[in-house]
Amino acid sequence: MPDFFETELRVGEIVKAEIFRKAKKPAYKLWINFGKSLGIKTSSAQITSLYTTQMLVGKMVIAVTNLEPRQVGPFISEVLVLGVDGKRDGDIILITPEDEANIGNRVH
């Protein structure tokens, strides 16, 4: 695991979202476009209480992009999408750029 100052956060756009039926807890499989330098990366996210798959496609997100890939059941999660706890227990709210940001841009 890289140290804090080596953590790479980038803006991505969710281009595909599916229900992760084989996950132990309710989750989605996400495909996120990070532009030319990184391309499309995958992630598993337990965000089903506030989002549908239709709501997620086209959504801009912030993700950690330089972690080792992680096996989540039969799925490989390549990036970690960031979120914050919601008002209700178990709710996760995705962190998104306030204005349109360019896909692949680093977060400073």
Residue positions per predicted region:
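Phosphate-backbone binding interfaces of nucleic-acid-interacting proteins
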Residues: M1-H108
